[in-house]
Amino acid sequence: MSEPVGRAVLIAGPTASGKSGLALALAEKLGGEIVNADSMQLYREMRVLTARPSEEEEARVPHHLYGVTAASAPLSAGRWAVLAAEKMREIAARGRLPVVVGGTGLYFRALIEGLAPIPAIPDDVRAAVRAEVGDAGPHAHALLAEADPALAATIRPSDLQRIARGIEVARATGRPLSAWQQIPPEPLVSGTFAKIMLMPDRAWLQARCDRRFDLMLEEGALEEAAAMTALGLDPALPAAKALGLRPLMRHLAGEITLEEAAAAGKAETRAYAKRQETWLRTQMIAWKGFSTQHSESLNAEILSFIDDLGLTRS
């Protein structure tokens, strides 16, 4: 059952679109606290590689759910939504405004629309399935097709993470994930929400992706990649797929030059931003889109939108 949080600002958008800067500006203006809705910024080992707010920015207003889990311990969308809902209620109880920001659309969906009530998967089942899927490689999709044909029809053979999820749910619960997904979900929170989606010009966004990757290299991305390499993570883990991480690891292994790694990292980031744009436009059509770049004029436009909804403080 959803619990009311009164009012909140939700900010979505592709990577490098200026979400974090906007969230900080709004939180300072409206007496808010920021809640992270970016799946990669949950990991404590990758502040630079995931473009988490800096320590200086985090000191300006309270930030929640940043760097809260290890790269080896990913959080599901459902688990994140539970944590985010708790933070939103705590923030509202203090008389402040929750500002939830990130580019992981599924997280927002889990929070305000709900997800299927799938039981927790035992660790031994999860570990066994992940090992089996890893060993099967390109044949893993066939394993899913046996366990859940309907789900298999919607998943690419290369998406081992989702393949493993489908298999583990079927084995642990005796019911296919596709069947669980037919159960009407319940949102975790309710209230008056300003749903903001940043969609800047694509050429501007792609140039910003490139500049941001260069800045990451200056701020220590290579050192973070070295630390991640030392962890010896399973490459199937979500954290191992952080944008630019694999090219930098290849450079550290002597396989490619730093220039080649940077070019590959930038290409990954641009491609991901494009996929995010497509997903957000098609899956979050009820959100208010803002197509201009982050600026003072955009802030004023968004503040007007928030004020029209009655969310600004008196």
From Swiss-Prot:
Cofactor list: Mg(2+)
Residue sites binding substrate per the record: T15, A16, S17, G18, K19, S20
Catalytic reactions of this protein: adenosine(37) in tRNA + dimethylallyl diphosphate = N(6)-dimethylallyladenosine(37) in tRNA + diphosphate
Binding site for ATP: G13, P14, T15, A16, S17, G18, K19, S20
GO terms classed as biological process: tRNA modification
Site (Interaction with substrate tRNA): T104, R126
Keyword Ubl conjugation: no
Highest taxon listed in the record's lineage: Bacteria
KW ATP-binding (keyword) present: yes
Annotated stretches, region: Interaction with substrate tRNA: 38-41, 161-165
Pfam families: IPPT
Molecular function, one GO term: tRNA dimethylallyltransferase activity
Keywords of this entry: ATP-binding, Magnesium, Nucleotide-binding, Transferase, tRNA processing
Enzyme Commission number(s): 2.5.1.75
Assigned protein family: Belongs to the IPP transferase family.
Subunit structure: Monomer.
Function according to Swiss-Prot or TrEMBL: Catalyzes the transfer of a dimethylallyl group onto the adenine at position 37 in tRNAs that read codons beginning with uridine, leading to the formation of N6-(dimethylallyl)adenosine (i(6)A).
Protein name: tRNA dimethylallyltransferase
Species for this entry: Parvibaculum lavamentivorans (strain DS-1 / DSM 13023 / NCIMB 13966)
Gene behind this protein: miaA
